[in-house]
C-alpha cells in the first residue's frame, strides 16, 4: 500500500461555515510525478543495499532457507530449475515486480486525479447552488412577507368595499324616503289645486252676484232719493203726526243698517287679522323651505365630494392591483428559477450517485488487485526474505498510511453525513416552497372569492334596476289616481253648472221682486252683505291657497331638480362601473350607446317641454277631455321609450355576455348595428308624431278661441233676455210663493258655506300637519348630516390607512430594487 499525497485546499473557493473542508488536488500535476520518481529511486537504493553480493551474511542465510524450501517442494518456480537459481533472475523478477507495481500506482494516481478534479467541480457547483438557494430563500421570505401584506391589504379593501356598500344602501334608503315624500307632497298639491279651482269658481260666482248687488244698490239709492223727495212733498201735505211716525220708522231702519255695517266692519277686521297670520305662516314656511333647499345643496356637494373620493380610491385600488399582478409575475418568474435550480440539483445528485457507484466499483477492483498482489507476495516471500525487513518497514509505513486512510475515510463518512444533513435541509426548504405554493393557491382562491363578490355587486345593481322599475309602476298608479281625481273634477264642474243655472233663475226672480217690494229687498241686502263677507273671506282664503300652491309648486320644482341630479349621479356611477368592467374592444360600442342615450335625453327634454305646454293647457277648464287624450298618447310614447330603455338594458346585458365570447360578438356586431339603425328610424318617426301632436294642439287652441267668441255671443243674448225680463214685472205677484222656496235654498247655501268653512279649517289643520312633517324632515336631515360627518371621518381614516399601505408598498419596492441591483452585481 502506497501513501496518498496530501491535497491542499483550493485557493479560489471561499470557506463557508456550512460546507465541510475536503482534501483537494494540488495546483500543478508535475509535482505528483516528481514525488513519485524520488520515492522509486529511494526504493532502488534500498534494494541494492540489501543485495546478497554486497552483504554475504544475508546471502548465506537466504541460500540455506531457499534450499530447505526447495527440498520441501514449496516453491513451484524453483522446482523446475533443479535447485539452481541465479541472482540475475532474481533481479529481473524484482525489477518486473517493481515495474508492475509502478504501473498500478500510476493507474491509481491517475484515477485519484480524475476523482479529485470531479470532486472540486462538484464542490464548486455545490457551493454556487447553495449560494443561489440562500438567495432564493431570502427572496422567498420577502415574497412571503409581501404576500402577508397583500392579504392584509385585500382584507382592508374588502372592509372598504363593505363600507361603500353600506353607504350605497343608506343613500338608496334616503332616496326612497325622498321619493315617498315627493309622492305625498304631489298628492297634497293636487288636492290643493282642486280646492283652489273650486274656490276660484265660487269667487267668480260671488263676483257676478256682487255686480248684481251693486246694480241693485244703485237702483235702491235712486229709489231712496225718490222717497226722500216724496217725503218732502208729503211733509207739506200730510200732518206732523204722520211725519213723525214715518221719521221714527226711518230712524229705526237707519239704526239697523248702521249696526249691520259695524258688524261687517268687525268681520272684515277679523278676516284681515287671519289673513296676516296666514301670511306670516306662509313666510315662515318659505324660509324653512329655503333652509331645506340650502341643506339639500350642501348634501349634494358632500355627495359629489364623496364620489370624487370614491373615484380616487378606485384608481388607487386599480394601481395597487396592477402592482400586485406585477409582484405575482415576479413570484412566478422566481418560482421558475427555483424549479430550474431544483432540476440542476437533481442532476447533480444523480452525478454524485454515479460517482459513488464508480468509486465503489474501483474499490472492489482495488481489493481484488490487492488480493492478487498479496498472493504474489506470499509466493515471493521465499525468494525475497532478505527484503522482508525493508518490506516490513515499508509495511509499517503502509500501515500508518492505512490508518491515515481510515481516518480520511472516517472524515469522508462524516462529510457524507453532513451532506445528508444538507440534503435533509434542502428537502425542508423544498417543503417550505411547497407551503409557499399552497399559500399561492390560497391567494388564487381569495381572488376567486373577490370575483364572486363582484358578481354579487352586479346582482345588487340588477336589484336596483328592478326597484327602479317598481318605482315607475308606482308612478303609473299615481297617474291613474290623478285620472280618477280628474273625473271627480268633471262631476264637480257639472254640479257647478247646475248651480249657475239656478243662480240665473235667482237673478231673474230678484229683479222682479226688487221693483215690487223694497222692504224685502232690504232683507235681501242684509243677506247679500253676509254673502259679501263670506265672499271676502273666501277670497282671502283663495289667495292664501294660491300662495301655498305657488310655494308647493316651487318645492316640487326644486325636488324635481334634485331628483334629476340624483338620477344623473346614478347614471354617472353606472357609466363608471361599465367603464371598469368593459374592455378596450367594447369602447366603440359604448360610444354608440352613449350617443343613443344623448338622443334619448334630448327626447326626454322635448317631452318635458311638451309636458309644460300640456300643464299650461290644463288650466283651460273646458278642454280637459281633449288634453287627457293627448296625455294618454304621451304616456304611450313614454311606455315606448321605457321599452326602448329596457331594450338598451338588454343590449348591455348582451354586451356583458359578449365579454366572455368575443368571437361570437364580432359576428353579432353587424346585427346590433342594424338594430341601432332601426331604433334611430323609430325615434325619427316618434319625433314626427310629436310634431303632428303639436299641430293638433294648435288646432285645438283655435277651436277654444272660437268657443270663447260663441260664449261672448251667448252673453249678449243673455243681456237681451234680461231686458225682456223687465217687461215681465206684472207676473212677479205669482212668484211670491216661489220666494219662500228660494229663501230655503239660501239657507241651504248658507249651510254649504258653513261646510266650506269647516273644510277650510281642516285644510289649516293639514297645513299644520305639513309643518310638523317638515320639522320631522329637518330632524332627519340633521341626523343624516351627522351620519355624513361620521362617514367622512371613516373615509379619512381609510385614507390614512391607504397612505400607510402606500408607504409600505414603496418600502417593498425599494427593497426589491436593492435585491435586483444585488442580483445584477452577482
Curated annotation (Swiss-Prot):
Residues 1-100, 297-327, 345-425, 502-534, 547-646, 658-826 are annotated as: Disordered. Keywords: Coiled coil. InterPro entries: GOLGA6L (IPR026737). Residues 31-52, 86-100, 658-678, 686-826 have a biased composition (Basic and acidic residues). It comes from the Eukaryota. Residues 157-822 form a coiled coil. Residues 53-63, 71-83 have a biased composition (Polar residues). Belongs to the GOLGA6 family. This is Golgin subfamily A member 6-like protein 25. It comes from Homo sapiens. The gene is GOLGA6L25.
Amino acid at each position: 500500500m502506497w501513501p496518498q499525497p496530501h491535497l491542499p485546499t483550493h485557493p479560489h473557493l471561499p470557506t463557508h461555515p456550512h460546507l465541510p473542508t475536503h482534501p483537494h488536488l494540488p495546483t500543478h500535476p508535475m509535482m505528483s510525478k516528481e514525488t513519485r520518481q524520488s520515492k522509486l529511486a529511494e526504493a532502488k537504493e534500498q534494494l541494492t543495499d540489501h543485495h546478497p553480493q554486497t552483504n554475504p551474511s544475508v546471502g548465506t542465510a537466504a541460500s540455506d532457507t531457499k534450499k530447505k524450501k526447495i527440498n520441501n517442494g514449496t516453491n513451484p518456480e524453483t522446482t523446475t530449475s533443479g535447485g539452481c537459481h541465479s541472482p540475475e533472475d532474481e533481479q529481473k523478477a524484482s525489477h518486473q515486480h517493481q515495474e508492475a507495481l509502478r504501473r498500478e500506482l500510476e493507474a491509481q494516481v491517475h484515477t485519484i486525479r480524475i476523482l479529485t478534479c470531479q470532486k472540486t467541480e462538484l464542490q464548486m457547483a455545490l457551493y454556487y447552488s447553495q449560494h443561489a438557494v440562500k438567495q432564493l430563500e431570502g427572496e422567498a421570505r420577502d415574497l412571503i412577507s409581501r404576500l402577508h401584506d397583500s392579504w392584509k391589504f385585500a382584507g382592508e379593501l374588502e372592509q372598504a368595499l363593505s363600507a361603500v356598500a353600506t353607504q350605497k344602501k343608506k343613500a338608496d334608503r334616503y332616496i326612497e324616503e325622498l321619493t315617498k315624500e315627493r309622492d305625498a307632497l304631489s298628492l297634497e298639491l293636487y288636492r290643493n289645486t282642486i280646492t283652489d279651482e273650486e274656490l276660484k269658481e265660487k269667487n267668480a260666482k260671488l263676483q257676478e252676484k256682487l255686480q248684481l248687488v251693486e246694480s241693485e244698490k244703485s237702483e235702491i239709492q235712486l229709489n231712496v232719493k225718490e222717497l226722500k223727495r216724496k217725503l218732502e212733498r208729503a211733509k207739506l201735505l200730510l200732518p206732523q203726526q204722520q211725519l213723525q211716525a214715518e221719521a221714527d220708522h226711518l230712524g229705526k231702519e237707519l239704526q239697523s243698517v248702521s249696526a249691520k255695517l259695524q258688524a261687517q266692519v268687525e268681520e272684515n277686521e277679523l278676516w284681515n287679522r287671519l289673513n296676516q297670520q296666514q301670511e306670516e305662516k306662509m313666510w315662515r314656511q318659505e324660509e324653512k323651505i329655503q333652509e331645506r333647499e340650502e341643506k339639500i345643496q350642501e348634501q349634494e356637494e358632500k355627495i359629489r365630494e364623496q364620489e370624487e373620493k370614491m373615484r380616487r380610491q378606485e384608481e388607487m385600488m386599480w394601481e395597487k392591483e396592477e402592482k400586485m399582478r406585477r409582484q405575482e409575475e415576479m413570484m412566478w418568474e422566481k418560482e421558475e428559477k427555483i424549479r430550474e435550480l431544483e432540476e440542476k440539483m437533481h442532476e447533480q445528485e444523480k452525478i454524485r450517485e454515479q460517482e459513488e457507484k464508480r468509486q465503489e466499483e474501483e474499490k472492489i477492483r482495488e481489493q481484488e488487485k490487492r488480493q492478487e498482489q498479496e498472493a504474489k507476495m506470499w509466493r515471493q516471500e521465499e525468494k525475497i526474505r532478505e527484503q522482508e525487513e525493508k518490506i516490513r518497514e515499508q509495511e509499517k509505513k503502509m500501515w500508518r498510511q492505512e490508518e491515515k486512510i481510515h481516518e480520511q475515510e472516517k472524515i469522508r463518512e462524516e462529510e457524507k453525513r453532513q451532506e445528508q444533513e444538507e440534503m435533509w435541509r434542502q428537502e425542508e426548504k423544498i417543503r417550505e416552497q411547497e407551503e409557499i405554493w399552497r399559500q399561492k393557491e390560497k391567494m388564487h382562491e381569495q381572488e376567486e372569492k373577490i370575483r364572486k363578490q363582484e358578481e354579487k355587486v352586479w346582482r345588487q345593481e340588477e336589484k336596483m334596476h328592478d326597484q327602479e322599475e317598481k318605482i315607475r309602476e308606482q308612478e303609473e298608479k299615481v297617474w291613474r289616481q290623478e285620472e280618477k281625481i280628474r273625473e271627480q273634477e268633471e262631476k264637480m264642474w257639472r254640479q257647478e253648472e247646475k248651480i249657475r243655472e239656478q243662480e240665473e233663475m235667482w237673478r231673474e226672480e230678484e229683479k222682479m221682486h226688487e221693483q215690487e217690494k223694497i222692504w224685502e229687498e232690504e232683507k235681501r241686502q242684509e243677506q247679500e252683505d253676509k254673502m259679501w263677507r263670506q265672499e271676502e273671506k273666501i277670497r282671502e282664503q283663495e289667495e292664501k291657497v294660491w300662495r301655498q300652491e305657488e310655494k308647493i309648486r316651487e318645492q316640487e320644482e326644486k325636488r324635481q331638480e334634485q331628483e334629476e341630479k340624483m338620477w344623473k349621479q346614478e347614471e354617472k356611477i353606472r357609466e363608471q362601473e361599465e367603464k371598469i368592467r368593459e374592455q378596450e374592444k367594447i369602447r366603440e360600442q359604448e360610444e354608440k350607446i352613449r350617443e343613443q342615450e344623448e338622443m334619448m335625453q334630448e327626447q326626454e327634454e322635448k317631452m318635458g317641454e311638451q309636458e309644460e305646454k300640456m300643464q299650461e293647457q290644463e288650466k283651460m277648464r273646458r278642454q280637459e277631455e281633449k288634453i287627457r287624450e293627448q296625455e294618454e298618447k304621451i304616456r304611450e310614447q313614454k311606455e315606448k321609450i321605457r321599452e326602448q330603455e329596457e331594450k338598451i338594458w338588454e343590449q348591455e346585458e348582451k354586451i356583458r355576455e359578449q365579454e366572455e365570447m368575443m368571437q361570437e360578438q364580432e359576428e353579432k356586431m353587424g346585427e346590433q348595428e342594424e338594430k341601432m339603425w332601426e331604433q334611430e328610424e323609430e325615434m325619427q318617426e316618434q319625433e314626427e308624431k310629436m310634431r303632428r301632436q303639436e299641430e293638433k294642439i294648435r288646432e285645438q287652441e283655435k277651436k277654444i278661441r272660437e268657443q270663447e267668441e260663441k260664449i261672448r255671443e251667448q252673453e249678449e243674448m243673455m243681456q237681451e233676455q234680461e231686458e225682456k225680463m223687465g217687461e215681465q214685472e206684472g207676473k212677479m205677484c205669482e212668484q211670491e210663493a216661489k220666494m219662500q222656496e228660494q229663501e230655503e235654498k239660501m239657507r241651504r247655501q248658507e249651510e254649504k258655506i258653513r261646510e266650506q268653512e269647516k273644510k277650510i279649517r281642516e285644510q289649516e289643520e293639514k297645513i299644520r300637519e305639513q309643518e310638523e312633517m317638515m320639522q320631522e324632515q329637518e330632524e332627519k336631515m340633521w341626523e343624516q348630516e351627522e351620519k355624513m360627518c361620521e362617514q367622512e371621518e371613516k373615509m379619512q381614516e381609510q385614507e390614512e390607512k391607504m397612505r400607510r399601505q402606500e408607504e409600505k408598498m414603496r418600502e417593498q419596492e425599494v427593497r426589491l430594487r436593492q435585491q435586483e441591483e444585488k442580483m445584477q452585481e452577482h
